[in-house]
Amino acid sequence: MNDLDSLRQEAERLKNTIRDARKNALDTTLVQATAGMDPIGRIQMRTRRTLRGHLAKIYAMHWGSDSRNLVSASQDGKLIVWDSYTTNKVHAIPLRSSWVMTCAYAPSGSYVACGGLDNICSIYSLKTREGNVRVSRELPGHTGYLSCCRFVDDNQIVTSSGDMTCALWDIETGQQCTQFTGHTGDVMSLSLSPNMRTFTSGACDASAKLWDIRDGMCRQTFPGHESDINAVTFFPNGHAFATGSDDATCRLFDIRADQELAMYSHDNIICGITSVAFSKSGKLLLAGYDDFNCNVWDSMRTERAGVLAGHDNRVSCLGVTEDGMAVATGSWDSFLKIWN
């Protein structure tokens, strides 16, 4: 037996030891702990606004921190900033590359970012003196497509990429400050913790990881999914996060318990999940699916509480406002819908 085989066996043994230790530490399950809770009841949301203007598939959206404006990115090569109250377009930004996969709104509202198959994260300034929108910085450095980006503040942004890494950038200098390596597949999504000190990532190696932004270390790895993880989102209190995967399940992982707490699945659901988001309280988990629907889950009882049906194609992205008052879904049908 060669060294490689013995190392593989050793790694497998260690994995099993960790799995068993996690199991032994589990004194109750979420379903048992919440059995006495009242069910939420049926959640029925209506479409309040439809944002029309993109001419092709929408791939990504992100709410601004004012809970009014949002940015969306489409295959039509446009980044549009919308006023969700009036449905007006505040900015329509033509992109150099139309192969865009992600977009982000800075917490200050002064910048938006996007990227995709060009491997570059482009930062656009919305608050120029001339009143026009222009590229304020391009961040090249990833050797694979840009799958997700999120601003820490106006001068720092975290990106995830198909090159199996994530990166923290200094926007002013355009330099990569930290590279986060450890995934063994394309990193598809990231989510910043509420305190902005850590972030989680989901990847095509079917694992999620928790990273420390300050020192670049992987703090924890969460296995469990059986296929690519397409989406991750933090629980509002920062102690847990949810994932959505091509294995047709969403899962809830607890950071302090270091393991999976819950799985959200149904025999009738056989398609992958593209996007996930929590309500402000964390009581609801919203998930967008390849079958054109968005399911609403009771996050504590792991039961389906409702469905948002209104798109004519895959729901590719969704987000809940910071004030918790509305949900936006974006779809390959080229429309964004605002629900509450």
UniProtKB/Swiss-Prot annotation:
Statement: the UniProt record of this protein carries the keyword Membrane: no
WD repeat ranges, renumbered to this chain: 53-83, 95-125, 141-170, 182-212, 224-254, 268-298, 310-340
InterPro entries, per database record: G-protein_beta_WD-40_rep, Gprotein_B, Guanine_nucleotide-bd_bsu, WD40/YVTN_repeat-like_dom_sf, WD40_repeat_CS, WD40_repeat_dom_sf, WD40_rpt
CDD domains, A to Z: WD40
Domain of life (superkingdom): Eukaryota
GO biological process entries: signal transduction
Pfam families referenced in this protein's UniProt entry, alphabetically: WD40_Gbeta
Gene3D superfamilies: YVTN repeat-like/Quinoprotein amine dehydrogenase
Keywords: Repeat, Transducer, WD repeat
Entries under PANTHER family matching the protein: GUANINE NUCLEOTIDE-BINDING PROTEIN BETA G PROTEIN BETA (PTHR19850)
Complex formation: G proteins are composed of 3 units, alpha, beta and gamma.
Family per record: Belongs to the WD repeat G protein beta family.
Function statement: Guanine nucleotide-binding proteins (G proteins) are involved as a modulator or transducer in various transmembrane signaling systems. The beta and gamma chains are required for the GTPase activity, for replacement of GDP by GTP, and for G protein-effector interaction.
Protein name (Swiss-Prot/TrEMBL): Guanine nucleotide-binding protein G(I)/G(S)/G(T) subunit beta-1
Organism: Homarus americanus (American lobster)
UniProt gene name: GBETA1
